[in-house]
């Protein structure tokens, strides 16, 4: 038989010659969408007021076996930052943007304030919904509710079950807040299923209610559709309440607040274990990314602890903003490791949207970075800097023990620091450096009540001091201010603070509106 027309090299019909290019073509042909790996399910568990020293994998005496096991098989985030209070952390989680860019840099959203995360911000659930996800939220909102347009079901969540305000009773599900015209406080129900009051859960502990709703959502979820579940537990925010049996293992803790708190953490740990079990039972776990994070540091006045870190909830010290967290997933390329790469709560939005195959188109400029390769593969973090906050109107709602007020603000500042007014409450991280200005909040160290007779170790800083520089890698406990040894670092970071300050929007902190009064309905609800 003669050679095939157009062939070279002596290849004959039926021989290997023509098949090799065909094989290469098939190998190089783009995979069909149906052949690609399906987008992962995402479960984001946010604990409330959980301290650095309140988890077993950080060396706490509190027993957290389920969280410890997930952390041990995943990636522990050891250089991860959140905000000092709940609204700031939650808003930055869902927008991927610093609070100075939304007018939320001052304190938090109060119950009767006509305020919420700006409605022109596109939130994480909206972006994931655009990517084909089912989006569900269970638990604490605290991002404003004065208008129905501010509610979770109007901001991208298919379903919502939880409470809208900052804290409430774990059993009655009532929240109390001041009503200015009454010169007193009003208490009312704050629990909703969708947008309707949920009145049938009295005397049922909130962590159990939220866990039941989360596991039901998982059990009923079609595995072929990607799931986003945002589970924002009430635990372990005050009031200090927990079923008695969860306190019994902690009889050795003499401090009553710490003992109740420990029981609350144990119940939270059990809840996360039940959620994980539900994911496995439904066959979702092998394609799930589970993220666990606190929203801010522990509140030492309510049993929490951040030892050996300095400070507590409400402060820019490490005890207020160093986030306890981890990522657990069979999809991780590295497991059982601790990441020292710099990360921030704003990073979750771009990370999860990109992981979902979605797009951040339509958002305002993001401050977060996609850190999935950092978490999953151990790559260097794309983040080298993060803004902690800038709040010219800061007041200390949680003063140091024995102190009743915020130290008086000194508006004069040395000329050598003229790049930024150092009397302003602000903070910034750059690589290993951390700069604080103004009054960062109570700078005491608080040893664990169960391990020491000393309730706090006061700072020796002058009350008029308004500038600190720390090498956090060498000094995570913030005991050695090195600002005098590194004036050029100070100047550079002050210049960065000034840049952020100039590009911030004015803080929006409207006065309380007495029309919020729930007297007529007995339920906290939108009023405008």
Swiss-Prot record:
<feature type="binding site">
    <location>
        <position position="313"/>
    </location>
    <ligand>
        <name>substrate</name>
    </ligand>
</feature>
<feature type="disulfide bond">
    <location>
        <begin position="116"/>
        <end position="150"/>
    </location>
</feature>
<comment type="subunit">
    <text>Homodimer.</text>
</comment>
<comment type="similarity">
    <text>Belongs to the sulfatase family.</text>
</comment>
<dbReference type="GO" id="GO:0007584">
    <property type="term" value="P:response to nutrient"/>
</dbReference>
<feature type="binding site">
    <location>
        <position position="237"/>
    </location>
    <ligand>
        <name>substrate</name>
    </ligand>
</feature>
<feature type="glycosylation site" description="N-linked (GlcNAc...) asparagine">
    <location>
        <position position="286"/>
    </location>
</feature>
<feature type="disulfide bond">
    <location>
        <begin position="176"/>
        <end position="187"/>
    </location>
</feature>
<feature type="binding site">
    <location>
        <position position="296"/>
    </location>
    <ligand>
        <name>Ca(2+)</name>
    </ligand>
</feature>
<feature type="active site">
    <location>
        <position position="142"/>
    </location>
</feature>
<dbReference type="GO" id="GO:0009268">
    <property type="term" value="P:response to pH"/>
</dbReference>
<dbReference type="GO" id="GO:0010976">
    <property type="term" value="P:positive regulation of neuron projection development"/>
</dbReference>
<keyword id="KW-0378">Hydrolase</keyword>
<dbReference type="Pfam" id="PF00884">
    <property type="entry name" value="Sulfatase"/>
</dbReference>
<dbReference type="GO" id="GO:0030209">
    <property type="term" value="P:dermatan sulfate proteoglycan catabolic process"/>
</dbReference>
<dbReference type="GO" id="GO:0043627">
    <property type="term" value="P:response to estrogen"/>
</dbReference>
<feature type="glycosylation site" description="N-linked (GlcNAc...) asparagine">
    <location>
        <position position="183"/>
    </location>
</feature>
<feature type="glycosylation site" description="N-linked (GlcNAc...) asparagine">
    <location>
        <position position="274"/>
    </location>
</feature>
<dbReference type="GO" id="GO:0051597">
    <property type="term" value="P:response to methylmercury"/>
</dbReference>
<dbReference type="GO" id="GO:0008484">
    <property type="term" value="F:sulfuric ester hydrolase activity"/>
</dbReference>
<dbReference type="GO" id="GO:0061580">
    <property type="term" value="P:colon epithelial cell migration"/>
</dbReference>
<feature type="binding site">
    <location>
        <position position="48"/>
    </location>
    <ligand>
        <name>Ca(2+)</name>
    </ligand>
</feature>
<feature type="disulfide bond">
    <location>
        <begin position="112"/>
        <end position="516"/>
    </location>
</feature>
<dbReference type="InterPro" id="IPR024607">
    <property type="entry name" value="Sulfatase_CS"/>
</dbReference>
<feature type="binding site">
    <location>
        <position position="295"/>
    </location>
    <ligand>
        <name>Ca(2+)</name>
    </ligand>
</feature>
<dbReference type="GO" id="GO:0046872">
    <property type="term" value="F:metal ion binding"/>
</dbReference>
<dbReference type="InterPro" id="IPR017850">
    <property type="entry name" value="Alkaline_phosphatase_core_sf"/>
</dbReference>
<keyword id="KW-0479">Metal-binding</keyword>
<dbReference type="GO" id="GO:0010632">
    <property type="term" value="P:regulation of epithelial cell migration"/>
</dbReference>
<feature type="binding site">
    <location>
        <position position="140"/>
    </location>
    <ligand>
        <name>substrate</name>
    </ligand>
</feature>
<dbReference type="GO" id="GO:0043890">
    <property type="term" value="F:N-acetylgalactosamine-6-sulfatase activity"/>
</dbReference>
<dbReference type="InterPro" id="IPR000917">
    <property type="entry name" value="Sulfatase_N"/>
</dbReference>
<feature type="glycosylation site" description="N-linked (GlcNAc...) asparagine">
    <location>
        <position position="453"/>
    </location>
</feature>
<dbReference type="GO" id="GO:0003943">
    <property type="term" value="F:N-acetylgalactosamine-4-sulfatase activity"/>
</dbReference>
<dbReference type="InterPro" id="IPR047115">
    <property type="entry name" value="ARSB"/>
</dbReference>
<feature type="modified residue" description="3-oxoalanine (Cys)">
    <location>
        <position position="86"/>
    </location>
</feature>
<dbReference type="GO" id="GO:0006914">
    <property type="term" value="P:autophagy"/>
</dbReference>
<feature type="binding site">
    <location>
        <position position="49"/>
    </location>
    <ligand>
        <name>Ca(2+)</name>
    </ligand>
</feature>
<keyword id="KW-0325">Glycoprotein</keyword>
<comment type="function">
    <text>Removes sulfate groups from chondroitin-4-sulfate (C4S) and regulates its degradation. In the central nervous system, is a regulator of neurite outgrowth and neuronal plasticity, acting through the control of sulfate glycosaminoglycans and neurocan levels. Involved in the regulation of cell adhesion, cell migration and invasion in colonic epithelium.</text>
</comment>
<feature type="glycosylation site" description="N-linked (GlcNAc...) asparagine">
    <location>
        <position position="421"/>
    </location>
</feature>
<dbReference type="GO" id="GO:0009986">
    <property type="term" value="C:cell surface"/>
</dbReference>
